[in-house]
From Swiss-Prot:
It is found in: Cell inner membrane. This is Large-conductance mechanosensitive channel. The chain crosses the membrane at residues 16-36, 86-106. GO terms for cellular component: plasma membrane. Gene3D superfamilies: Large-conductance mechanosensitive channel, MscL, domain 1. The lineage of its organism: Bacteria, Pseudomonadati, Pseudomonadota, Betaproteobacteria, Burkholderiales. One of its GO terms (molecular function) is mechanosensitive monoatomic ion channel activity. It comes from Ralstonia pickettii (strain 12J). Its main location: membrane. The gene is mscL.
Length: 142
């Protein structure tokens, strides 16, 4: 029973709950970035470059069995080794956008923290200073 109580204390700590919330929000945010990359940015890049779909860019590394269409999905299903560089380009762009957004968020938080420096310590009241002087003078007497 002590194990369950220890686990409950561990799980209810603030850091664990904050981490769980961060993971959930991060997963949802990752889906937004995926959509941004796949639905908005990559179509623009493919329009400029002239390719319609980056995810289907690949190099076939071996002969395909007879009758297998030469599409990435069909070749993978047939077990043909392929070098799928188009998917890598999409994932790399996705990562760069996500990293840039996280950088902007951390930068904004850092600026907010730096903008509010800690308050200077309050001056010691005069009566406390006097009491300290008396204490120090009593310590010095033989």
């Amino acid at each position: 029973m002590a194990l369950m109580q220890d686990f409950k204390k561990f799980a209810m700590r603030g850091n664990v709950i904050d981490l769980a919330v961060g993971v959930i929000i991060g997963a949802a945010f990752g889906k937004i970035v995926d959509s941004l990359v796949n639905d908005l940015i990559m179509p623009l890049i493919s329009r400029i470059v002239g390719k319609l779909d980056f995810s289907n860019l690949f190099i076939q590394l071996a002969e395909a069995p007879a009758g297998v269409p030469h599409t990435l999905a069909d070749l993978k299903k047939a077990g043909v080794p392929v070098f799928a560089y188009g998917n890598f380009i999409t994932v790399a762009v996705n990562f760069l956008i996500l990293a840039f957004i996280v950088f902007l968020m951390v930068r904004a938080i850092t600026r907010m923290i730096d903008a509010n420096p800690p308050a200077a310590p309050a001056e010691t009241p005069e009566d406390i200073q006097l009491l300290r002087e008396i204490r120090d003078s009593l310590k010095n007497k033989p």
